């Protein structure tokens, strides 16, 4: 089944409570934790993640875009998010990070990989991974378009992982390019403006979910 995880950072930060109220019919909420060092932006911190978790029953997936992901393992486990990943580029020992999340009870654990990082950097962790996030825009490029070079990386990962690992694509995905993303081998996408930039975010999410599920069915992966 196709999964859609709208990114809360694309909603109005001045009215985050109102945005959160409008997400209650979603199946996932994506939270970017950016520290201003690994990437230039600063988004949500652990206090905000904890506040969101206390005020919604929607499963939360957290994408750590930080220099020291190990520092976030304990808080994430205490908060009880549903899924968490960090960038392979920021992890000297990715296996240690993944094992720590697993021991802490995080349901889904993963790695993220930047646009220009070779896909080979993640392939050896297949036995520990539940999912991989492929960042499909240039780093620090909020709002820039999807980069098609991501598709070949997803294809290679799907060939290597088979069906064992869920493949997510994050950045610039919309209703137009989603079929290409699914055909390349992705099962899930993170979107921002494609949902929260619309007049009716829930209706937009439902349209994207239908496109994704229809494409998976055509590919024989429903």
What residue spans do the PLM features occupy?
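Active-site/ligand-binding-proximal alpha/beta "capping" segment
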Residues: 133-183, 187-188, 194
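Short glycine/serine/threonine-biased micro-segments
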Residues: 34, 43, 108, 141, ...
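A generic structural signal for well-ordered alpha-helical segments
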Residues: 53, 101-102
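Conserved functional loop/turn residues at catalytic and ligand-binding sites
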Residues: 80, 105, 185, 190
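Short acidic, glycine/proline-enriched helix-loop-strand junctions
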Residues: 96, 103-108, 217
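Generic C-terminal helix-cap and adjacent flexible tail
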Residues: 210-222
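Conserved N-terminal beta1-alpha1 strand-loop-helix module at the mouth
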Residues: 1-85, 91-93, 109, 117, ...
């Amino acid at each position: 089944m196709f999964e859609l995880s709208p990114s809360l950072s694309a909603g109005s930060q001045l009215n985050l409570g109102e945005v959160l109220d409008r997400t209650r019919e979603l199946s996932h909420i994506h939270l970017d934790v950016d520290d201003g060092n690994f990437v230039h932006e600063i988004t949500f911190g652990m206090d905000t993640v904890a506040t969101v978790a206390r005020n919604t029953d929607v499963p939360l997936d957290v994408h750590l875009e930080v220099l020291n992901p190990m520092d976030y393992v304990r808080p994430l486990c205490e908060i009880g998010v549903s899924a968490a990943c960090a960038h392979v580029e920021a992890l000297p020992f990715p296996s240690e990070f993944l094992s720590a999340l697993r021991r802490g009870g995080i349901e889904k654990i993963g790695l993220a990989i930047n646009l220009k990082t070779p896909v080979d950097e993640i392939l050896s962790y297949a036995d520990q991974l539940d999912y991989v996030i492929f960042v499909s825009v240039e780093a620090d490029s909020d709002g820039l378009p999807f980069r098609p070079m991501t598709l070949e990386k997803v294809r290679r990962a799907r060939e290597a992982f088979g069906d064992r690992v869920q493949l997510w694509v994050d950045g610039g995905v919309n209703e137009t390019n989603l079929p290409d993303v699914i055909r390349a081998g992705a099962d899930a996408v993170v979107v921002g403006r494609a949902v929260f930039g619309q007049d009716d975010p829930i209706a937009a999410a439902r349209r994207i979910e239908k496109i994704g599920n229809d494409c998976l069915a055509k590919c024989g992966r429903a």
